[in-house]
Amino acid sequence: HISQSLNFDLAILEKYKDRCKNLKYIIIPIDYFSMYSTLENGIENWRVKNYSIYYDISTYGNYWSGFEIFNGKLPSNISRVKSYLLNRKSDVTCNKFGFGTNYNSKDSKDLMETGKTASKRHTIKLENNQTTFSKNIQTINSIIEFANSHNLKIIFITCPAYSTYRENLNPIQLENSVNIIKKLSSKNTNTAYYNFLTDKSFIAEDYYDAD
């Protein structure tokens, strides 16, 4: 899901562990911002309600996460309700296989502008987020333990991004994130890590936005 953080990756695995008899691989994205953020503490924390409402996953006493109407911007929610009631326009933006349908490179945004804005949005004040970094390491270790106990393999990936995004990243934040996942992967035989951030096989036409 968009903006899904590591703690919800783990929560979904634990919730559906008995329904995944044929599962062999778990793919976990570890991107520039992943180790220093959680969904609850980010600018898109309104998405937490999706896990409470549609997955019945605990959101740690957040009463308001049980309501669509009280999350996000009220005018947007009213517009969504009107669109459905008047035009039967669904707000579901994925296909039956779970793949998102909202973003298509044919309708791409300005790669120069989105590279700058996204990199700024994803850059964290490191000194204020060491606790989150440590908690996310614990979460990854829990995911690895889950995979071990269910005889699963984990593939960690860093997704490709356009040059205008990469050029504006904090090198320390990026290095910390890449190094920790390399370290955790090297210590566990059921894991692999692939870094596609600078992969040159992806060209401008492949991107919807720079990140």
Over which residues does each language-model region extend?
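Conserved SGNH/GDSL esterase-like catalytic core that processes O-acyl groups on lipids
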Residues: H1-Y54
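Active-site-proximal beta-strand/loop segments in catalytic clefts of secreted hydrolases
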Residues: I2, P29-D31, I157-P160, F196-D199
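Soluble non-cytosolic domains of exported or imported proteins
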Residues: S3-N7, Q130-I137, E175
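Loop/turn elements at helix/coil->beta-strand transitions in domains of secreted/extracellular proteins
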Residues: K21-Y25, N148-I155, N188-A192
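Secreted/periplasmic serine-hydrolase-like ester/acetyl group-modifying domain
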Residues: I30, L39, I43-H150
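Short catalytic/ligand-binding loop motif for oxyanion handling, primarily in non-cytosolic enzymes
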Residues: S34-T38, S163-R166, I203-A204
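Active-site segments of SGNH/GDSL-like serine hydrolases
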Residues: I144-L169
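C-terminal regions of proteins
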Residues: I172, N176-D211
